[in-house]
Structures are given as C-alpha cells and as structure tokens.
C-alpha cells in the first residue's frame, strides 16, 4: 500500500514522502497513530500543492534574510560595557548584548543565533556570526567601548 508520511518515521522516511509499506503496517499502526495517510490521487495532488506553497514560502524567507544580511553588513554596532583603566572589561560581552545593540538599530535577531568566536573581554572591534536562515549567515561588526564614554 502506498502512503504519505505525515511525520518523520525512522527507517521509512521524512514527512511528506510517499512510500510503499505492507497493508497491515499501514492499517494497524501508521494510519491510526496519525503518522501517515493513504496515497490517493486527491491526497497526492494536495501534497504537491502544499510542497509548492512551502517552497515559495521558504524562498521568500531566504530573500528576506539576504536583504537583512546586507543591511547588517553595512552596520557597525557600538556595545557599551564597564571597563577598567587598562581596557579590560568587568565581565564579558555576550551574544545577548549584541542582540540588544541590533535591536536598538531596528533589527531583531534571537541571541541564540549569534555566535562569538571567543569571549570578548577587552575594548576594541570584533566580529560575530549571525545565522539568519538555513543557509544565510552574516558577519556582525561591533565595537566595544567603555560605558563612561557613552554618557
């Protein structure tokens, strides 16, 4: 029997795949558990339509991420932190601080999508990577300045 998987099933395939399985496996386990539906002409057409819509949606999200990446590449953020006389920070600059600086510029990115190569513990210029979409990553340039110069 041919079925369309609604969920990822180990050893069978991913959601949306059309696979052939034994009738008993489909009727007694996969279909009652909501893991699959029968592959009829109507469901196959609906699956194709859904895949096309999903592809359009993903392409639009990718385009938006690329536009945002261009905007971010042109920015140089300023992150303010308390520092001693030697330029050593009292603490570290984290991805949350960079996300907050981006937010102040009107760009919302989740802090978990921003990665620093090494802990930032000194004043100066640095780079961080921000993953905007599946295959769209951008370098975020930021400068750490002493908090006293911010006021």
Curated annotation (Swiss-Prot):
PROSITE patterns: RIBOSOMAL_L9. GO terms for molecular function: rRNA binding; structural constituent of ribosome. Keywords: Ribonucleoprotein, Ribosomal protein, RNA-binding, rRNA-binding. One of its GO terms (cellular component) is ribonucleoprotein complex. The keyword Ribonucleoprotein applies. InterPro entries: Ribosomal_bL9, Ribosomal_bL9/RNase_H1_N, Ribosomal_bL9_bac/chp, Ribosomal_bL9_C, Ribosomal_bL9_C_sf, Ribosomal_bL9_N, Ribosomal_bL9_N_sf. It comes from the Bacteria. It holds the Pfam family Ribosomal_L9_C. The keyword Iron does not apply. Disulfide bonds: none annotated. GO terms for biological process: translation. Binds to the 23S rRNA. Belongs to the bacterial ribosomal protein bL9 family. This is Large ribosomal subunit protein bL9.
